[in-house]
Amino acid sequence: MSKRTFKIVILPGDGIGPEVVAEATRVLEVVSASSSDVEIKLETHDFGGCSIDKHGEPLTAATLEACKLADAILLGAIGGPKWGVNSKVRPEQALLALRKALGLYANIRPANFASDSLLAYSPLKPSVARGVDIIVIRELIGGAYFGERKELGARAQEDAAWDTMIYSVPEVQRITRSRRQVASPDPPLPVHSIDKANVLASSRLWRKVATETIQNEFPQLKLDHHLVDSASMLIVANPKKLNGVILTENLFGDILSDESSVIPGSLGLLPSASLAARPLWPNTAHRRSSPRRVYEPIHGSAPDIAGQGIANPIGTILSAAMLCGTRSVWRSPAKAIEAAVEGARRQGDRREGLRTADLGGSSKTKDIGHKVVEILKATL
C-alpha cells in the first residue's frame, strides 16, 4: 500500500528563522522516514521581509495558495529593522494576511518550565517563578488589529489617527469554545478571562458572552475575570495565580502572551500553534477532517544574532512536535520528539552540556538539532 502524503509548507522567514526551521525540518524528515504509512512532503516558500526583498510583497499569491492547500504550516520568524515600522510594505502584514485568509482565529501559547534547572534564567525570583504553568489563548483575527482605521494625514485637517476595536457575539463564542483544544487534566484547568470591561464596550460584550458560553457549554470549568491591567501586574508579581488558561482578545493577548513567555527565561524554548475553525478549501490530494494550523516558536527574528548559528532551536522543534501531535498517526512520534528534546536538555543541565547562548552556554544551533535528531533516530 502506498504512503499517504502529508504536505507541510515551510516558511523560514527572516533573521534566525531559517536557522531554527532547518533543525525542525531535520526532525520532520526523521519522522517521515520512520513512518510506514505516511510521507511528509515539505515545500518551502518566501514569507515576510525576505519576500519583500525578492518579490516586492510580504505574502505572494503563490505562497498563500500553497498555504491554503497545505495540511499544516511551520513558520520561523519575520521582521527586522531593515523593514521599519514607517515602511508602507512591512513583513508583519504577511502574518496578518495569512491569519485572515486561513481563518486562524486562535493562538495557543504555553509558558512553563521544562525543568527547575531553568529557574535560574527567569527574570523572576525562583520562589515566584517555580510552578508557573500558563497557557494563553489569544483571539487572532478580530479587535483593533482588524478594525477600521485611519492613518495620520498630510493636511492640517487630518491631524488625527484612529483604530476601532470591534467584537461580535459569534467571535467571542468561537474563541471561548477553543478552550476544548487544550488537553485538560482532571480536574480541568481553570479559565481566566482577561478584558477591560470597566472602560470598553467591546470588553463588556466579551465578558458577558464568555461567561454565558462557559456556563452553558462547559459548566465543569472554573471561570474568573481579570482586568488587563490587573492581569499584567499578576504575571510579574504572582503569576501562579493565573495558572491554567488565560483567554483574551487580540491586542491584550499580544501583550500578555509576550509578557508571560519571558517567565521561563528564554523565548527560544517555547512553541505555539494558531488554529482554524475548519478546512476552508478542498485539498485535491486527499480529504482532511481536521482544520489547518500554523506552528511557530514564540520568539522573534532576532536580527542581532542572525547568521551566527547560536539561536536556540528548541521552540521550533517543539512546534514541530505540536504539529505531529494533532495527527493520530503521529502522536507517538510527537511524544518521541518531546522526549528527544528533554534528553538533549538533560545533557544541557550538566556543566559542559548542550546549551545555547540564551541559556548561558556556547553550543551552536546545529549542535542542539543534531543531538535531538540523534536521540530521535534511536527511539523511532
Swiss-Prot record:
InterPro entries: IsoCit/isopropylmalate_DH_CS, IsoPropMal-DH-like_dom, Isopropylmalate_DH. Keywords: Amino-acid biosynthesis, Branched-chain amino acid biosynthesis, Cytoplasm, Leucine biosynthesis, Magnesium, Manganese, Metal-binding, NAD, Oxidoreductase. It catalyses: (2R,3S)-3-isopropylmalate + NAD(+) = 4-methyl-2-oxopentanoate + CO2 + NADH. Substrate binds at residues 99, 109, 138, 229. Pfam families: Iso_dh. NAD(+) binds at residues 80-92, 300-312. The keyword Metal-binding applies. Its EC number is 1.1.1.85. This is 3-isopropylmalate dehydrogenase. It comes from Phanerodontia chrysosporium. The gene is LEU2.
